[in-house]
Amino acid sequence: SEMCIRDRSSIDVLLVPGRLIDSGLSVEQATAQFGYLAGMAQPLLLMATIPTMSLATSLVPAVSEAFALNKWQIIEQKAATAMKLCCLITVPASVGMWVLAEPISCLLYGTAKAGVAIMHSAPAICLLGLQQVTTGMLQGMGHTNLPMLNMLIGIAAKLVAVLRLTNAEYGIAGAAWATNINFGVTALLNIIALYKFSIRFSWLSIAKIIAAAAVMGAVAVEVHMLLGGASALATIAAMLAAGISYIILLPLLGVLNRQELRQLPVVKRFFK
């Protein structure tokens, strides 16, 4: 797994700057563009997926124990809960980073120039989260080699995507989408493998999470525009308003029931 991560990073370092130069950028411009992706956008992606990495790590022994006892109902329950939690965290993070990419760039880095790289890296939060959690499920079921094989296939897809998409038309956005394709292919292959082992997920719940996140994104944009959109205060206020609207929408759409709300540290005090 560590080897795969190093290979993925090596593809970016070895190919992306060269592809940007081939597309017509100067060495200085290509270096700056790559810096926006690797030095500004990708750290945000990794930071946003820390909770899902922890979730995936805790999932392995839990699923492994149920698998050893041949308790498939418990495995399915844990897998469905983990997938739901993953989407609850990563889908709004992806939407928020997409719609507020430029303001986030200004807030954190003092420049709007990383906005494009941040925006087009946003889907990778959700896709990497899915990859992490599904990998944890498969490893817990004893299929340790399968996630690594799927990761290698994802890296191969990324290699092709970097060569095809990092060009004059797409620029650094193409390199960001190559990473999205990498995580997306790996996550999809993991999900297909889980389906072959009769693990099912509640896609209706996931669709509701996406709907809530979409409304949240609209709230973020509207609040940011109403407050002028140029200040750090406007960005922070937009994030807060978006977060509040998302939390309100989840129970209204039936994504979280009263019992699940009690388990959330932030709101459980209101559901005693």
Per-range role (PLM):
Residues M3-I5:
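Short, small-residue-biased leader/transition segments that mark boundaries at the very start
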Residues A30-T52, K84-L85:
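Alpha-helical transmembrane segments of polytopic membrane transporters and translocases
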Residues L46-L69:
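Helix-loop junctions and terminal segments of transmembrane helices
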Residues N145, I155-I192, A218, E222-L240:
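Membrane-interface helix-loop junctions in multi-pass transport and translocation proteins
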Residues V221-K272:
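Membrane-proximal transmembrane or re-entrant/amphipathic helices at the cytosolic face
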